[in-house]
UniProtKB/Swiss-Prot annotation:
The gene is dscB. It comes from Aspergillus fumigatus (strain ATCC MYA-4609 / CBS 101355 / FGSC A1100 / Af293) (Neosartorya fumigata). The lineage of its organism: Eukaryota, Fungi, Dikarya, Ascomycota, Pezizomycotina. It catalyses: S-ubiquitinyl-[E2 ubiquitin-conjugating enzyme]-L-cysteine + [acceptor protein]-L-lysine = [E2 ubiquitin-conjugating enzyme]-L-cysteine + N(6)-ubiquitinyl-[acceptor protein]-L-lysine. This is DSC E3 ubiquitin ligase complex subunit B. Keywords: Endoplasmic reticulum, Membrane, Transferase, Transmembrane, Transmembrane helix, Ubl conjugation pathway. Pathway: Protein modification; protein ubiquitination. Its EC number is 2.3.2.27. It is found in: Endoplasmic reticulum membrane. Component of the DSC E3 ubiquitin ligase complex composed of dscA, dscB, dscC and dscD. InterPro entries: Rhomboid-like_sf. GO terms for cellular component: endoplasmic reticulum membrane.
Amino acid sequence: MLTSGLTNAPITKLLLIYTIASSIALSILDIKHLASIHVSPHLWPYAQFWRLATWQLAGFTNSTEALFAAMLAYHLRVVERAWGKRKFATFIISTLPYTSLLPPLLLVLLRPLTLYKLNYLPCGPTATLFALLAQYHAGIPHTFRYRISTSTSTSTSSANRDTDASGRGEGAQGKHLTLLLSDKSTTYLVAAQLALSQFPGMMLPAAVGWVVGVAWRAEVLPVPSARWRVPAWAVGEKEMGRRGTQGGEGGERYEDLRRRLEGEAVAAAAAASGNAGSASEASGQRQRRREGGIMDRLRAL
């Protein structure tokens, strides 16, 4: 059964609230001009390189982008439920240097190739959201599929409408267009709206975020320590005792899952034993009734 809302997704809830709150703060404080990046003049000649570290953390400059980003973050909550909040937070933090630094650096390189027309990088956590979208695309299966079919029929009107059915059916010829969609299609539609909101500036962080997410999943993204994880206390979890071996770390990592599976196994065994007990009791009652019927017949004889 699907869980509604943001249940069991505290990091996604925090990301959603931060996206909306930071976008509102940009408007209230009237500091939108400090959030985005223009290669000229912000980086050259003003040398405002601090924008490379703040453009993704500043929020969005208009309500449309903030709305689509919040909707996309809400759809991506299933990734946190599948991974757990510790791995989810680790992914965001470990990919943050790449999603923050690569888009402006690529913008600097692409600017001369586009005859200095590509000069603007919109602010907001677009790259992080699309890195999460890559995990959603690769790791979350669809629940259902549906088809949308359209048809354009051209029928030839007959001179006499009282003719037989064979004469009327000859003119009916149709062209069909069928689209096969799934429950994940709405998520991709929201992501496309966000990527195309400030074309072509928003396309760059969206593409970089997707590539970073795919590279992280393929384990080709250079990270300082592949075994590093966010501390358990940072996400509200308790640190389990370490056993000092690799197997001990694996047991610590999946301790919660093991306890959950054990609880489900105990509940299933109890239900099975209850069903078996009720079935044996019912069979005993039927046997006693059968024996009682035989004794009554013998007494009648």
